[in-house]
């Protein structure tokens, strides 16, 4: 999700007001933000990932599965082609392959 949403940039802000690694829109998730988070709590990577993971977990539960939950999280619930979920899952696979190659090279050394 982070790779697709922000390209791993913790200071990313969208024109829609989404902030941080997981591109959380503060006005929709005020109740999930810490009271002592300062003016821009979602630009803190730890806070952003905690809130984003909670939002994603709720979305998966509410929508009945990973693909549907990802679609809702990405604001694309009505996309019949499930392009957002496909992008996220492709990014996950790419990262898993890169990690496996890295481990393989490390064990060869």
Where are the predicted features?
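Catalytic glycan-binding domains that act on GlcNAc-containing polysaccharides
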Residues: 1-109
């Amino acid at each position: 999700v982070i790779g697709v949403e922000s390209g791993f940039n913790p200071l990313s802000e969208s024109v829609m007001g989404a902030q941080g690694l997981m591109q959380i829109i503060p006005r929709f998730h005020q109740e999930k933000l810490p009271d002592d988070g300062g003016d821009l709590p979602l630009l803190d990577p730890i806070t952003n990932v905690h809130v984003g993971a909670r939002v994603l977990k709720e979305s998966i539960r509410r929508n009945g599965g990973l693909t549907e939950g990802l679609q809702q999280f990405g604001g694309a619930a009505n996309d019949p082609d499930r392009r957002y979920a496909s992008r996220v899952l492709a990014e996950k696979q790419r990262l898993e392959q890169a990690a496996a190659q890295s481990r393989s090279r490390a064990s060869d050394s």
